[in-house]
Amino acid sequence: MRLLTRLLSVLCLLAAAVPAAFGHSAGEEMSSAAAAFLGSLKADQKAKATFGFDDAERTNWIFVPAARKGLPLKEMNPGQRHFAQAILSVALSGRGHMKAEQIMALEQLLLEIEQGSGPKRDAENYFVSIFGTPDAKGTWGFRWEGHHLSLNFTLVNGELVSSTPSFFASNPGKIKEGQPGLVGFELLRYEDDLGRQLAKSLTAEQRKQGFLSKDPYKDIVTGNKQKADGLIKHKGIAATALTTEQKQMLGKIIFEYVSRTRPDFAARELTAIDAVKDSLVFAWNGGLEVGEPHYYSIQGPTFLF
């Protein structure tokens, strides 16, 4: 996919600017931010926020309103929240961080829309957890999680090796009422439009493989399982069966998701994906028109969007 290669080049330029601007690697920046956060906490707060790296809690994740472990934002003072946000800001790209902030802000909007008729909404009910001891050369993890947002990062020997599971969702999907100036706002519109654009471009013959069902899945296929392998069983149309233009569309979708993370890490991830581009599979379920329920996925040998 030539476009994916070009987009990768852009990210490489951004990644090269990271050391120039900050002078530190992901491991150095994230561990420094995490250590500052932990240093700002009182003993009882730190007890809630920290776990051993091998603790089973590290692989526990959930994206619905539920009881969680970790230290919630509501139990932090403004300074501590600032330190917590600093970890997120060096783990994500600027755009990824903005999306995360907008997801949390939508919880307040839901509270106003539902007026207490649904689950309790709380824009401060997002939890920060540190697994292991943050160290520039160490092995540790970081999680930021709440309703519709689950961000998980793992560092091994000081290198950021994983940003999954990663979950960004939006409710309402599109703001249709209330809040002057916000009506029409759709947080994940670009991701949605890119997937629909590719699906609509498929020919009748291609749709025999690419369209799995007229009915979308009723919920997230992976749920909060620890491993996604085999859940969709690599069904769909192979990237090798796409036209050049369609491959470019596929590359744009992949770039949009991967570039939520910091540029240097995203560049490495895109390089790895480009190496297995002929093994990618795209699948669509549901309607093709805006507003119709739908679900799409992109799957490779070791990952699932």
Residue positions per predicted region:
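A cross-kingdom marker for long, charged
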Residues: 24-93, 97-305
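Positively charged n-region of N-terminal signal peptides that target proteins for export
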Residues: 1-6
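Bacterial N-terminal signal peptides
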Residues: 8-20
